[in-house]
Structures are given as structure tokens and as C-alpha cells.
Swiss-Prot record:
The gene is era. Belongs to the TRAFAC class TrmE-Era-EngA-EngB-Septin-like GTPase superfamily. Era GTPase family. This is GTPase Era. Residues 154-156 are annotated as: G5. PROSITE patterns: G_ERA (PS51713), KH_TYPE_2 (PS50823). CDD domains: Era, KH-II_Era. Exhibits GTPase activity. Binds RNA but is probably not involved in ribosome assembly in mycobacteria. GO terms for cellular component: cell envelope; cytosol; extracellular region. It comes from the Bacteria. One of its GO terms (biological process) is ribosomal small subunit assembly.
Length: 299
């Protein structure tokens, strides 16, 4: 690769196939929310991979799925728009699950929406299964996508094959100048990242009905008047029902305090300063199905 290359790559796949973890591993810092709950990525976050010979801008999309709510439909539209605007699509299929109808549907969607975009298939989570299972999955993936797509097995957790994947992706980008200055790792505003970190902490270890019903809005960020080493962050967690409010707050407010502590530590890392984090929980009835409320909450 003699001339500098730069371009956009998006990872797609069923929910929970390791797309956000992969983004964070390639960038080398946390820019995408990771959670073992499916469908937790809501915005297309661009993580940026800098090397001397190339720059890869990673667009992290929500998992593509058959939508059940207006929010689900908007997330799917966002994914499809992204498909047609990038240089390379990385289809993520985990090594530890058999290929199913969801994977086939997504492959069909990619070929229908972006037939000319370069496709690389990434077999994720290879650390979770023995070598023979990885080999069998590579064969199955090859049957699914045919001879045109390159297939790369990786583990974002252990780092195995990440350098190979980076080189494969970079090799498929067009020649061109860097889009972002060296050292910049994401173009997401800090407030969006803070909201995502709070959302991630709130989703940790809760029941299945909550992820889709939880939205976080940063209400105010301001330096503390009498202290230049402290920033006050006020955030509101919106849920759809009273019962969900109870889940988020927990007995005597214990769960909300845990969420606050976990999120505050991550936000302090992000901002590089001490943070006072104030969290409130409010109900926005059925916000996922209401266009006005979706707009107000940033979708």
C-alpha cells in the first residue's frame, strides 16, 4: 500500500454479534456502547483508526432486525442509509452460533441495498469455540456469501487477528487524504458519549424488557463555580412505564446509585476531570411509538 488510503467502513449483523466490541478494539478506546443486551446501539458512531498509511472511519450501526416499533423502523432506516454511503461493509457473524435466517436476511438486505459496495465477512468471537468449530463456521459462511467476499476470523476480546482485519479493510479503501486529524478517535459530541455511557451502566444486568424502553438525555453540563477541577453533569433517564422506573431506581435508590457510580467513572475517563453526576428518572409513555417524543429524545 504505497499511497495513503482513507474511507468509511460499517459493521453490520444481527444484534449482539460483537460489532461494538470490535469497533472499540480496533480504535483502541471506548467509543461504542457494549452490552450483552441486543439492540443497544442507537446512533452511528464513528470510531477512527489511524495508521501511517491509512485512516479507517468505522461507522457503528444498530443491529439490523425486523422492526416492531417506530423506533425499530427508524433504526433500520439509519442502517440502510449507512450501507449505501460507505466504502466497505463488514458483515459480522459470530463463531459460536449457527448461521440462521437472520444472517441470511441481512446478507440479502446488504446485496439489495448496496450491491456494489465491497463486502468483508468477519467471523467474530473465535475465542469462544474450539478451532474445528471455527473452521466449520468459515465453511458455512463461505457457502452463504459465495466466492466474492473475503472472510476474516477474529476475536475482539483477545485481539487475535485484529491486525489482519485492519489490513484487509484498509486495502479495500480508495486512495485519498485523511478525513480527521491524527489523534481524534471519534466525531461524536461528548454529550452523546456521556449519555451512551450512562445508558450502558443502566442496562447492565437488568431484565429483558428494559433496553428498548430506556433513553438518556443530558440536561446540563457546567463547570462547578468555585472549583475548576469539577464538572457537574445532570442527566435524565426516560422509561416508558412506572414499573420500569422501579427497576432503574431499585430498592431505596440502590440501583440508581450503582448506575451513577459506574457511569461517573467512565465519564471522568472520557473528560479527564472529576465529575459530579446527577441522575433523574422520568416516564415518557410509549415514547418508542410516538414520533414527537422520538424527536425530542434525539431519534
Amino acid at each position: 500500500m504505497s499511497e495513503f488510503r482513507s474511507g468509511f467502513v460499517c459493521f453490520v449483523g444481527r444484534p449482539n454479534t460483537g460489532k461494538s466490541t470490535l469497533t472499540n478494539a480496533l480504535v483502541g478506546t471506548k467509543v461504542a456502547i457494549t452490552s450483552n443486551r441486543p439492540q443497544t446501539t442507537r446512533h452511528t458512531i464513528r470510531g477512527i483508526v489511524h495508521r501511517d498509511e491509512f485512516q479507517i472511519i468505522l461507522v457503528d450501526t444498530p443491529g439490523l432486525h425486523r422492526p416492531r416499533t417506530l423506533l425499530g423502523q427508524r433504526l433500520n432506516d439509519l442502517v440502510k442509509t449507512t450501507y449505501s454511503e460507505v466504502d466497505v461493509i463488514g458483515l459480522c457473524i459470530p463463531a459460536d452460533e449457527a448461521i440462521g435466517p437472520g444472517d441470511r436476511w441481512i446478507h440479502e438486505q446488504i446485496r439489495a441495498v448496496a450491491p456494489r459496495t465491497t463486502l468483508v465477512v468477519i467471523v467474530t468471537k473465535i475465542d469462544k469455540v474450539p478451532r474445528d468449530r471455527v473452521a466449520a463456521q468459515l465453511m458455512a459462511v463461505s457457502e452463504l456469501v459465495g466466492p466474492d467476499a473475503e472472510i476474516v476470523p477474529v476475536s475482539a476480546t483477545t485481539g487475535e487477528q485484529l491486525d489482519v482485519l485492519t489490513d484487509v479493510l484498509a486495502g479495500k479503501l480508495p486512495p485519498g487524504p485523511a478525513f480527521y486529524p491524527d489523534g481524534e478517535l471519534t466525531d461524536e459530541p461528548e454529550e452523546t458519549l456521556m449519555a451512551e455511557l450512562i445508558r450502558e451502566a443502566a442496562l447492565e444486568g437488568v431484565r429483558d424488557e428494559l433496553p428498548h424502553s430506556l433513553a438518556v438525555v443530558i440536561d446540563e453540563v457546567s463547570p462547578r463555580e468555585d472549583r475548576d477541577d469539577l464538572i457537574d453533569v445532570h442527566a435524565i433517564l426516560y422509561v416508558e412505564r412506572d414499573s420500569q422506573k422501579g427497576i432503574v431506581i431499585g430498592k431505596g435508590g440502590a440501583r440508581l446509585r450503582e448506575v451513577g457510580t459506574a457511569a461517573r467513572l467512565q465519564i471522568e475517563k472520557l473528560l479527564g476531570t472529576k465529575v459530579y453526576l446527577d441522575l433523574r428518572v422520568k416516564i415518557a409513555k410509549n415514547w418508542q411509538r410516538d414520533p414527537k417524543q422520538l424527536g425530542r429524545l434525539g431519534f
